From Swiss-Prot:
The tight homopentamer forms a pore with an opening of about 4 Angstroms in diameter which opens into a wider tunnel at the base of the truncated pyramid. The pore is positively charged. Its main location: other. It is found in: Carboxysome. The lineage of its organism: Bacteria, Bacillati, Cyanobacteriota, Cyanophyceae, Gloeobacterales. This is Carboxysome shell vertex protein CcmL. HAMAP family: CcmL. Keywords: Bacterial microcompartment, Carbon dioxide fixation, Carboxysome, Photosynthesis. It holds the Pfam family EutN_CcmL. GO terms for biological process: carbon fixation; photosynthesis. It comes from Gloeobacter violaceus (strain ATCC 29082 / PCC 7421).
Length: 100
C-alpha cells in the first residue's frame, strides 16, 4: 500500500466496458515526511474519496483483489481514506486539522 493525496479526477468518456461507472482519481504520492513527491498515479476510487484527502491505495495484483476489481483492468485502487498518520510518535497528518 502507498499514501497519496487526491489532486483531481480523470474523466474518460470512451473506455473498456467493465470500467463504465468507475470513478478515477489523480493521486500525488506522499513521502515518509508527509511531503508531496513529483509522482502521480491514476487510481480507481473504491471508497468515495474527495479532493485533497489523503488516501491509501494498492497497486498491481493487490489492486485486483479488491471486491469489484477482480475482472477489471486496473493497476491502482483507492482502498481507504486516511484519518491520521504518525511517524516516531509524532503526528504527520490529521484529516480534522487539514481544513484549519
Amino acid at each position: 500500500m502507498q499514501i497519496g493525496r487526491v489532486r483531481g479526477t480523470v474523466v474518460s468518456s470512451q473506455k473498456e466496458p467493465s470500467m463504465v461507472g468507475v470513478k478515477f482519481l489523480l493521486l500525488q504520492l506522499i513521502d515518509e515526511a508527509g511531503q508531496p513527491l513529483p509522482q502521480y498515479e491514476v487510481a480507481a476510487d473504491g471508497v468515495g474519496a474527495g479532493l485533497d484527502e489523503w488516501v491509501l491505495f494498492s497497486r498491481g495484483s493487490a489492486a485486483r483483489q479488491v471486491a469489484g476489481s477482480e475482472k477489471r483492468p486496473v493497476d491502482a485502487v483507492v482502498i481507504g481514506i486516511i484519518d491520521t498518520v504518525s511517524v516516531d510518535n509524532r503526528p504527520l497528518y490529521s484529516k480534522k486539522d487539514q481544513y484549519r
